[in-house]
């Protein structure tokens, strides 16, 4: 890549807005019901009825194989059988389910998510990884894991944004949710978001 191309690329990055940081270290227990201090969903600030969750879709390999093979993969809980994309959407969006947080009994801060395994982009290795959302899990990547960056957002200084890359607009009707480092700037297809804790019944979730 030539020097001119590199300079142009970085000039574009510098021209875009920086994502909003959010802090989950001061979540209170008021009106939060469930195990420990409570369970709750994360709503996007300024977008009523839009929550952090997952969209599920069937891959091409699933659609082309026999019903018996597909059923066996489903029963075996194969992680890549029905890929889940972390996104933001309303409760009535098809194939969407919100991520349910559970709080720690001592601190009332987020401890784990309802789903056990969620794909995320490891910006250190540049690979897609599957990580436990539990903050205390043995197999959690303490620094690079998406879950731990969310749980300790102030310490790690992460930024959160909703993004609409070209591939997502083709296969999904909802954007991806991306985590950026504090010193990164956003691509032009990303928009900064901020999240807040909401009690599931108050948000319309049973």
Swiss-Prot record:
Top-level taxon of the source organism: Eukaryota
Alphabetical keyword list: Cytoplasm, Signal, Zinc
Disulfide bonds listed in the record: none
Range of residues in the leader sequence: 1-19
GO cellular component: cytosol
Pfam families the record matches: Vel1p (PF10339)
Induction, per UniProt: By zinc depletion.
Protein name from the UniProt record: VEL1-related protein SCY_5430
Species the sequence originates in: Saccharomyces cerevisiae (strain YJM789)
